[in-house]
From Swiss-Prot:
Name of the encoding gene: rpl7ae
Lineage, broadest ranks: Archaea, Methanobacteriati, Methanobacteriota, Thermococci, Thermococcales
Location of the protein in the cell: Cytoplasm
Keywords tagged on the record: Cytoplasm, Ribonucleoprotein, Ribosomal protein, RNA-binding, rRNA-binding, tRNA processing
Assembly and interaction partners: Part of the 50S ribosomal subunit. May be part of the RNase P complex. Reconstituted enzyme missing individual protein subunits is suboptimally active, showing each subunit contributes to optimization of activity.
InterPro entries: eL8/uL1-like, Ribosomal_eL30-like_sf, Ribosomal_eL8-like_CS, Ribosomal_eL8/eL30/eS12/Gad45, Ribosomal_eL8/Nhp2, Ribosomal_eL8_arc
NCBIfam families (UniProt xref): eL8_ribo
Temperature section of the record: Optimum temperature is 72-76 degrees Celsius for RNase P reconstituted with this protein as well as protein subunits Rnp1-4.
GO cellular component: cytoplasm; ribonucleoprotein complex; ribosome
GO molecular function annotation: ribonuclease P activity; rRNA binding; structural constituent of ribosome
Protein name in the entry: Large ribosomal subunit protein eL8
One of the GO BP terms on file: tRNA 5'-leader removal
Any matching Pfam family: Ribosomal_L7Ae
UniProt record similarity statement: Belongs to the eukaryotic ribosomal protein eL8 family.
Cited function: Multifunctional RNA-binding protein that recognizes the K-turn motif in ribosomal RNA, box H/ACA, box C/D and box C'/D' sRNAs. When added to reconstituted ribonuclease P (RNase P) it increases the optimum temperature to that of the partially purified enzyme and causes a 5-fold increase in apparent Vmax. Binds the RNase P catalytic RNA.
Length: 123
């Protein structure tokens, strides 16, 4: 299956797994925003340290605005394969199209590592 139009770069599986791990750690020791509306607000306000976007969002328009918005605000973003997995990592029982890490807590080093690798992928 072809990647949706909003997916601008390929994310290695292990990096996507690290992103989900960072969401779980930040959920427990820091602060996250769940869902596209909350994520969009966090990006617009410049609060997000890392944005995680699911690749299987339908319709695409729900999250299509996030990559250009993150680029404009210079906030790193990454894709994960499943909105269900992203929701679970965020601690909710439903799927999440996107999540923003506001305060990484104990995931600070992991978030910085992911952000650095994402910048390399985007080149």
């Amino acid at each position: 299956m072809a990647k949706p139009s909003y997916v601008k770069f390929e994310v290695p599986k292990e990096l996507a797994e690290k992103a989900l791990q960072a969401v779980e750690i930040a959920r427990d020791t820091g602060k996250i925003r769940k869902g596209t509306n909350e994520t969009t607000k966090a990006v617009e306000r410049g609060q997000a340290k890392l944005v995680i976007i699911a690749e299987d969002v339908d319709p695409e328009e729900i999250v299509a605005h996030l990559p250009p918005l993150c680029e404009e605000k210079e906030i790193p973003y990454i894709y994960v394969p499943s909105k269900k997995e992203l929701g679970a990592a965020a601690g909710i029982e439903v799927a999440a199209a996107s999540v923003a890490i506001i305060e990484p807590g104990k995931a600070r080093d992991l978030v910085e590592e992911i952000a650095m690798k994402v910048r390399e992928l985007m080149k």
